[in-house]
């Protein structure tokens, strides 16, 4: 497609000439960076293919299984594929795990008992986990079962306070939870290497403590996963990275055999464990999504870096910045006002293939302590590997952008978000012209 054809198509989708030119100039400056993402995607794609071949995935794995799900070949083989790809002893990969929060709650409840203590050495957890833990009172929380919680605040640079972590470890500490991604914060997302250093520090002092990593938004961003650097469990959602945009539901937990067995008994029933839980016809999408995931994540990473560079040049604080290494697919942009957050999200929604005509508004979403706006014209409801953006309507008024099943769609979404902010009067068109 030549430049004239490109501009014409973007114009049909509501992008002004100035915004299109700004996008083209930004993309041109990122060619070397994008090549690095392509190389990581190639490595991870081969890793997934090897795991599938090693575990003899066959057409029979896609068969519809109902009822109890005894001897569900597709389900059992897929769990072996995940364990192979993530280099763990075992995995639990199920449509009955409804989301990332459910997977995390399951892993915690399965491996903690009354009197145990849960420690977060990375500060406050993601908002929805506050009710799981009992930071905000909720029915069925860990706190109701006599499980205590403490957290160690991060240093000013967003990294680990090792002396405070050492002081927080005590005889009650049973499990340490490490959130890889920033969530609704402006701290850094952590590299696998940094997570490995933290785990090694904890294990040197308490080898018996379980180290669990919330791996949401991080799968296939790097060539290794937290399970390669000492994590006892990694946990994630199939409507994020590993589902590749095709999985319609599901979550996974991968790690040590005993811990995964505990999770299986908690998910189903003591005595039943992994033996039940029919796959109900979703296996082909689970396999195919996992196969495509490295390439899809690559497109999302390109979109995140593109967004960082687009908004950083306009003077907005972005985390990570346009040049930093990437450790998840989330791009935070601090817009400084509710109007900015809303206009950004409306632009993302307008770029969607589904529900592009819908105008998102902030609302009191369950599990959050403030109104939240979410833009996601997705094929799978709530899928954040698809083009999406969200943010709480509270200071510092940051928006969190992620996903895009293809780089082209991620690019369109960012340009539409900028166009939306210009149309709403949040960003001046004169400022865009200055950057051309």
Language-model segments: which ranges?
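Interfaces and regulatory segments of ATP-dependent nucleotide/adenylate/phosphodiester-chemistry enzymes
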Residues: 1
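Conserved PLP-enzyme active-site core in the AAT-like
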Residues: 4-27, 31, 38, 48-54, ...
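Aromatic- and Gly/Pro-rich donor/ligand-binding loops
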Residues: 64
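Flexible linker/loop signature enriched in Pro/Ser/Thr and Pro/Gly
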Residues: 85-88
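Conserved C-terminal alpha-helix-loop-beta "cap" of PLP-dependent enzymes
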Residues: 312-435
């Amino acid at each position: 497609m030549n430049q004239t054809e490109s501009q014409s198509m973007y114009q049909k989708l509501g992008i002004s000439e100035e915004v299109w030119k700004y996008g083209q100039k930004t993309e041109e400056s990122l060619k070397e960076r994008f090549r690095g993402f392509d190389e990581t995607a190639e490595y991870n794609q081969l890793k997934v293919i090897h795991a599938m071949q090693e575990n003899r995935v066959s057409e029979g794995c896609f068969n519809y299984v109902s009822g109890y799900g005894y001897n569900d070949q597709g389900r059992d083989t897929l769990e072996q594929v995940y364990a192979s790809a993530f280099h763990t002893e075992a995995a639990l990969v199920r449509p009955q795990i409804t989301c990332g929060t459910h997977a995390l709650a399951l892993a915690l409840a399965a491996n903690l008992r009354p009197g145990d203590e849960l420690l977060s050495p990375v500060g406050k957890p993601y908002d929805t986990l506050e009710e799981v833990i009992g930071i905000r009172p909720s029915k069925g929380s860990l706190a109701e079962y006599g499980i205590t919680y403490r957290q160690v605040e991060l240093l000013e640079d967003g990294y680990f306070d090792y002396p405070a972590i050492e002081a927080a470890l005590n005889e009650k500490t049973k499990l340490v939870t490490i959130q890889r991604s920033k969530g609704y914060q402006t701290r850094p997302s952590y590299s696998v290497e940094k997570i490995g250093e933290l785990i090694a520090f904890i294990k040197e002092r308490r080898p018996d403590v379980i180290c669990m990593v919330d791996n949401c938004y991080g799968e296939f961003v790097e060539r290794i996963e937290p399970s390669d650097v000492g994590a006892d469990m990694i946990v994630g959602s199939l409507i994020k990275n590993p589902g590749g945009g095709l999985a319609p539901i599901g979550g996974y937990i991968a790690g040590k055999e005993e811990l995964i067995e505990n999770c299986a008994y908690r998910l189903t029933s003591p005595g039943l464990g992994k033996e039940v839980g029919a796959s109900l016809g979703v296996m082909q999408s689970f396999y195919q999504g996992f196969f495509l995931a490295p390439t899809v994540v690559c497109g999302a990473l390109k979109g995140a870096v593109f967004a960082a560079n687009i908004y950083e040049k306009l003077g907005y604080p972005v985390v990570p910045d346009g040049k930093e290494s990437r450790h998840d697919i989330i791009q935070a942009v601090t817009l400084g006002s509710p109007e900015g957050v809303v206009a950004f999200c409306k632009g993302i929604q307008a770029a969607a293939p589904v529900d592009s005509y819908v105008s998102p508004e902030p609302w009191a979403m369950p599990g959050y302590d403030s109104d939240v706006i979410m833009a996601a014209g997705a094929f799978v409801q709530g899928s954040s590997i698809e083009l999406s953006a969200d943010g709480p309507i509270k200071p510092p008024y940051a928006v969190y952008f992620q996903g895009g099943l293809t780089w082209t769609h991620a690019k369109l979404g960012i340009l539409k978000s900028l166009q939306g902010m210009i149309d709403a009067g949040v960003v001046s068109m004169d400022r865009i012209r200055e950057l051309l």
